[in-house]
């Protein structure tokens, strides 16, 4: 399992605007699995990145760091 950071907009019908970008963290086996997990949400996914090493450690220090686990 790995931790993925997902950048998204709240509404699929809206044009992507950087200032409206939100993030969530999802634990999964692959980017594809994370996309399948999120497909029923009305998210306009911009980008998904796998977090590892120092980058993951940095993100874990954020008060907004909460991981959703795929079941």
From Swiss-Prot:
EC number: 2.7.7.6
GO cellular component: DNA-directed RNA polymerase complex
Reactions accelerated catalytically: RNA(n) + a ribonucleoside 5'-triphosphate = RNA(n+1) + diphosphate
Top enzyme class: transferase
UniProt key word RNA-binding: no
UniProt xrefs under Pfam families: RpoY
Biological processes annotated in GO: DNA-templated transcription
NADP as UniProt keyword: no
Signal sequence segment: none
Keywords: DNA-directed RNA polymerase, Nucleotidyltransferase, Transcription, Transferase
Physiological role: A non-essential component of RNA polymerase (RNAP).
The protein's name in its UniProt record: DNA-directed RNA polymerase subunit epsilon
Source organism of this protein record: Staphylococcus carnosus (strain TM300)
């Amino acid at each position: 399992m790995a931790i993925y950071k997902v950048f998204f907009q709240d509404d699929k019908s809206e044009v992507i605007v950087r200032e409206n970008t939100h993030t969530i963290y999802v634990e999964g086996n692959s980017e594809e699995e994370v996309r399948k997990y999120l497909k029923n949400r009305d998210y306009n996914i911009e980008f998904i990145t796998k977090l590892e090493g120092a980058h993951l450690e940095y993100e874990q220090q954020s008060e907004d760091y909460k991981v959703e686990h795929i079941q």
